[in-house]
């Protein structure tokens, strides 16, 4: 009764045990997971080292060649967050461009010797004719100062007087109360000025920012993307598009365009406007500056302006008529963002640096400062006509790269002109809500790079992932480590990013091979580029960056492999562990939901906070397994006693036996020598070579007696008394051999007795096994007969029941059939009876 009452509880326990289905932590290598990262990027360009064009020089020293086959992989079902205002790529590009400018100025001459007193007069140049046209009649005069000053010659104690033309913005009067014509250069009390080398050019060339191996660049392909928020159209690339590092304020020149519409990116008081169409701007400096050279010291040459041929007023820029429509569209967009009461105005020219109050850019080596009031003032009618911007030219320029650093741009001979495209604006706004004032701005060059890099961000590939699995690590045996082969391209590793975890885990081996092969491929490309330009990369900031990028990926890969090795997962794409999975790590998400609905990226975000805990538990479990394996291996040595009788170990046993016998013989020889020496020292001589000396009988536990007359004699034995050294040695060797013979005989008897006992035990064991076999066979035969009889009885009973049922069914069918057949007869009989 008690057994029957316990059955329900037992069944319930079994059902609970089966239904619990515990999960274990499983390690996956090669999962498509990435995280936001900051790393050292390097640049690539299409510059040619053999080209004689000056603007290729710095690109060949700075960048590696571009990839002729750039790869871009579209990530389906992936949503990624971008924030252009916190994008470290823009800050890194800022530092890199600064380094490039400073590097290009390193060998150039410092102009400290020019910080002297100058006597200056106004100079309007030598007019070569009336070249003023109607379109330039309202341009500003470009006033010049003709200054003379004393400089030190190549011989230090001698001086000479020279003269040079300076723009009025580059000199300031010295107010010492003596003479109103004394001037100095504007930089002398604030800025260290370097003269640009004669061959230095600031013409930009497109550069591509590239991620090192082990990293990737995410790209947002959505139109009208604000640069801050989620993007659903995401792809991964290795390098950005070609970015021209054009330095300018107020207007963005030669940048990228949006594919759909005008986009305004707003952050704080900054407004970055990106157009979808370009507006051309053509700038000109007519006339001919005649340049001269003045030696200001040993190997130091100052390139000055000797005279100007032509009209000094003709420095200007022409903005095409498309400006009006694009500016009107931009204003509507800004009013929609800030409010309808927003007003627009140009920069105040009364205060501030020229770089902020004017449009500053470099045109063919000269620095232009253009008045943009005609572009931004609402009073100006800008519809369907070309706008002329008056420009100034400065030779002493405050560099945007560092505070208190400047550059002297040597004069450029001949006519200067350059054509650019306006692709956006840099604006600021101020005022209270509803009454905003928008005006052009500049000076913070990082905004230029943000405008180009808004759709990019750098991520690091994290190929190691953990997830719950139903399998548990069972054994501690060593497995052969698998080696990964080389596969496809690196970016294909993220191709399964939008797939669910179950679908992506099927291709883990391919993804792991892709990861390694991509690293190897990128390392080879980078090494080839560096080897091709190693003579140019010396002492270059970019050379250091490229070498760092070269080492970084291998370090990351080795780190991942070391982690897998510590977990006992080296060389495996799927590795099972003995760590139970805690449902709280995954917020109690069901197993089927994890593997069928989540991508690896979504799963990583869910368990990221617990990754450290899980990794520690896996490492502890592996350490415990190593301890268990060591103990098992030590125990396994005692479990293999039969290996002691392996034929390969017999020589070792024979060697040990020979050493033991040699040791015993050596000890006996030493004992014999000591005995001989003792006898010789006693000084006796035996009477004969052999004398019979009776010995007393000894009991089993009595010491041997040698004197006569002590007790009775059982038997006599002869003791050999010899003389001579060789005879004594022979006697001792004979006794030793007899001793060894007796010991070996005893050992053989013991071994024979042991073998007899083992044989008897083995025979007895075989008899027991035979009896057990007979009993088992009898039991099997008995139960087989019983099962056979039961089966026969069951078949007989079934046959009888079926036969009886069949007979009854047949009889019933016959009765029904006869009844149906008798119906006409019964009808006829009824009719006959009715008629009678």
UniProtKB/Swiss-Prot annotation:
Spans annotated as Immunosuppression: 545-563
InterPro entries: Gp120_core_sf (IPR036377), Gp160 (IPR037527), GP41-like (IPR000328), HIV1_Gp120 (IPR000777)
Gene3D superfamilies: 1.10.287.210, Human immunodeficiency virus 1, Gp160, envelope glycoprotein, Single helix bin
Coiled coil: 605-639
GO biological process: clathrin-dependent endocytosis of virus by host cell; fusion of virus membrane with host endosome membrane; fusion of virus membrane with host plasma membrane; positive regulation of plasma membrane raft polarization; positive regulation of receptor clustering; viral protein processing; virion attachment to host cell
Annotated stretches, region: Disordered: 696-715
Motif segment (YXXL motif): 684-687
Regions that span the bilayer: 657-677
Sequence segments annotated as region (V4): 370-391
Location of the motif Di-leucine internalization motif: 835-836
Modification after translation, per record: Highly glycosylated by host. The high number of glycan on the protein is reffered to as 'glycan shield' because it contributes to hide protein sequence from adaptive immune system. Palmitoylation of the transmembrane protein and of Env polyprotein (prior to its proteolytic cleavage) is essential for their association with host cell membrane lipid rafts. Palmitoylation is therefore required for envelope trafficking to classical lipid rafts, but not for viral replication.
Claim: Disulfide bond is one of the keywords in the record: yes
Region feature V2, mapped onto this chain: 147-188
UniProt entry tagged with the keyword Metal-binding: no
Region listing for V3, in residue ranges: 283-316
Region feature (CD4-binding loop): 349-359
Additional note from the record: Inhibitors targeting HIV-1 viral envelope proteins are used as antiretroviral drugs. Attachment of virions to the cell surface via non-specific interactions and CD4 binding can be blocked by inhibitors that include cyanovirin-N, cyclotriazadisulfonamide analogs, PRO 2000, TNX 355 and PRO 542. In addition, BMS 806 can block CD4-induced conformational changes. Env interactions with the coreceptor molecules can be targeted by CCR5 antagonists including SCH-D, maraviroc (UK 427857) and aplaviroc (GW 873140), and the CXCR4 antagonist AMD 070. HIV-1 lineages are divided in three main groups, M (for Major), O (for Outlier), and N (for New, or Non-M, Non-O). The vast majority of strains found worldwide belong to the group M. Group O seems to be endemic to and largely confined to Cameroon and neighboring countries in West Central Africa, where these viruses represent a small minority of HIV-1 strains. The group N is represented by a limited number of isolates from Cameroonian persons. The group M is further subdivided in 9 clades or subtypes (A to D, F to H, J and K).
Family assignment from sequence similarity: Belongs to the HIV-1 env protein family.
Name of this chain's protein: Envelope glycoprotein gp160
Organism: Human immunodeficiency virus type 1 group N (isolate YBF106) (HIV-1)
